[in-house]
């Protein structure tokens, strides 16, 4: 039993979720991995679509009962992939944090392709400020600083895609569609 997983990884505001949405729209045969998290939903996020939002107690219960494939702490919140989230018979795609990637790498039954989504600091900050009507600037700064440390070195990246501009994003989607097609044969 093996799971094929494309993992998108990148700093806050890099556009990981947008890229994943576009890839799933273009390739409906993909299994979109919806992670669990203990953080609160951001404006516009929907439970079961963007994440499964759970309490710390609920998350701990999922881990203890073996219902989590991987679990990690990132930027003061817990994130994880439920056992039922990955499908053996599909190409799985999801957004993961560095600790989640490291956990997935420990599993011998996971064929993992890690794609780093890159955008400039300026564009990432602008995107985060524009994401919500009343952004929490302190939280944006905290995440920015934490990301600098957490993403300093990622030795487990297979590809890096430029998501800095609309044109770059369109080219990244085109290239990622080629990666998906290669997987699917």
Question: Model regions: which residues?
Answer:
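ATP-dependent small-molecule kinase phosphotransfer cores
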Residues: 37-92, 96-99
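NTP-dependent small-molecule kinase module
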Residues: 126-135, 152-185
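P-loop (Walker A) phosphate-binding loop of NTP-binding proteins
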Residues: 11
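Hydrophobic anchor at the beta1->P-loop junction of P-loop NTPases
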Residues: 8
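Walker A/P-loop
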Residues: 17
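Conserved phosphate-donor/acceptor-positioning beta-strand/loop module used by diverse small-molecule
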Residues: 93-97, 107-129
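ATP-binding Walker
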Residues: 14
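Post-Walker A helix-loop "phosphate-sensing" segment adjacent to the P-loop in P-loop NTPases
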Residues: 25-33
């Amino acid at each position: 039993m093996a799971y094929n997983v494309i993992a998108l990884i990148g700093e806050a505001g890099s556009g990981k979720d947008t890229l994943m949405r576009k890839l799933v729209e273009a390739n409906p045969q993909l299994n979109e991995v919806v992670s669990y998290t203990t953080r609160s939903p951001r404006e516009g996020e929907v439970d079961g679509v963007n994440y499964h939002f759970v309490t710390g107690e609920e998350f701990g219960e999922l881990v203890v009962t073996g219902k989590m494939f991987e679990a990690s702490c990132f930027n003061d919140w817990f994130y994880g992939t439920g056992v039922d989230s990955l499908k053996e018979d599909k190409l799985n795609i999801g957004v993961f944090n560095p600790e989640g990637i490291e956990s997935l790498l420990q599993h011998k039954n996971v064929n993992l392709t890690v794609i780093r989504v890159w955008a400039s600091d300026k564009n990432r900050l602008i995107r985060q400020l524009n994401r919500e009507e009343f952004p929490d600037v302190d939280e944006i700064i905290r995440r920015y600083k934490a990301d600098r440390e957490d993403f300093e070195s990622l030795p487990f990246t297979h590809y890096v895609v430029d998501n800095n501009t609309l044109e770059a994003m369109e080219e990244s989607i085109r290239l990622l569609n080629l990666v998906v097609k290669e997987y699917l044969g």
